[in-house]
């Protein structure tokens, strides 16, 4: 049976993967309300398409931090990809490169920055947590820089791991044949033994709970890579992030895996965009499963979106070919959405192309 949309990979991955692995990728925090809401909120945004516009040629190309990419659809960092498929991050890196877009490598990857760089050319960002031992952070950043990575996506919503109950029930542990490749050979000190998500026996216990805005300024002293602050949900924090030197903001709720009952990212996006006043680009991850979702995010002011779970599920189902197909399907759907909405380039996508539940009834301009 031919796969015709991104969501269909979910069921295939569920059937293929061990329960512990699938649940790790699929689950959210606590009641998983935000996990559902990340999807549901997109469904409450409707289109106001414009007609009789020549849409014979559609241009989806854009630039992110000065790097030209083929479309505003990028790959979010997801941990432990070799649990999904033996090729893991290698396959994802090759697929993103073939699609002409950016891959963000998780620092909790099962392939190292050097290994991912060895897959060939491509624009790659490195996701970073700040650890208690700052020497570890420095080593990770230097290695990413040396391996040709172009930016840091600093995760700021995880002073502690969220409570993901399926991981507790399944007693989640990384399969014994896999390691956190970026930490091999680094002195991590004594690991904390805790029971947050059964994960803390790994590097999680080393995440620095004292992380604050001054650490973003410190990071800028050890690297020239631009820093994207990932995990912003409010206008207040967007403004502070810019003051602290952020080159961009990723509106993210960590795939609904941290604090439950935060808004869907698509619901938080516009507040953040307004607060930045165009000073830095704003991106979104969380709940994107259709080209229509990509369009809605851009109409609300995002410069691009990142996808996480769809990549991992497609990887589990079909390896590199699956990830390529997910990126291609989203690209094709997004192109079609642009055409049917009357937009020939990303700059033509405006707030007037959508209507949200928080919009007041419109008084149409006199023509």
Curated annotation (Swiss-Prot):
Keywords (A to Z) from UniProt: Acetylation, Flavoprotein, FMN, Glycolate pathway, Oxidoreductase, Peroxisome, Photorespiration
Described by its record, this protein's role is as follows: Catalyzes the oxidation of glycolate to glyoxylate, with a reduction of O2 to H2O2. Is a key enzyme in photorespiration in green plants. Glycolate is the preferred substrate, but to a lesser extent, this oxidase is also able to use hydroxypyruvate, L-lactate and glycerate as substrates in vitro.
A GO CC annotation given for this chain: peroxisome
Task: Kindly list the organism's lineage.
Answer: Eukaryota, Viridiplantae, Streptophyta, Embryophyta, Tracheophyta
> What is the organism field in this record?
Arabidopsis thaliana (Mouse-ear cress)
Q: What is its EC number?
A: 1.1.3.15
Domain called FMN hydroxy acid dehydrogenase: residue spans: 1-359
Amino acids binding FMN: 77-79, 106, 127-129, 155, 230, 252, 285-289, 308-309
Cofactor field: FMN
PROSITE patterns in the record, alphabetically? FMN_HYDROXY_ACID_DH_1 (PS00557), FMN_HYDROXY_ACID_DH_2 (PS51349)
Q: Where does glyoxylate bind?
A: 24, 129, 164, 254, 257
MF terms (GO), sorted A to Z: (S)-2-hydroxy-acid oxidase activity; FMN binding
Which PANTHER family does its entry note?
GLYCOLATE OXIDASE 2, S -2-HYDROXY-ACID OXIDASE-RELATED
Primary gene name: GLO2
Fetch the InterPro entries from UniProt: Aldolase_TIM, Alpha-hydoxy_acid_DH_FMN, FMN-dep_DH, FMN_HAD, FMN_hydac_DH_AS
The family this protein is said to belong to: Belongs to the FMN-dependent alpha-hydroxy acid dehydrogenase family.
Q: What is its main location?
A: other
Pfam families (alphabetical): FMN_dh
Q: Which CDD domains match?
A: alpha_hydroxyacid_oxid_FMN
Q: How does it assemble?
A: Homotetramer.
Protein name as it appears in the record: Glycolate oxidase 2
Q: In which pathway does it act?
A: Photosynthesis; photorespiration; glycine from 2-phosphoglycolate: step 2/3
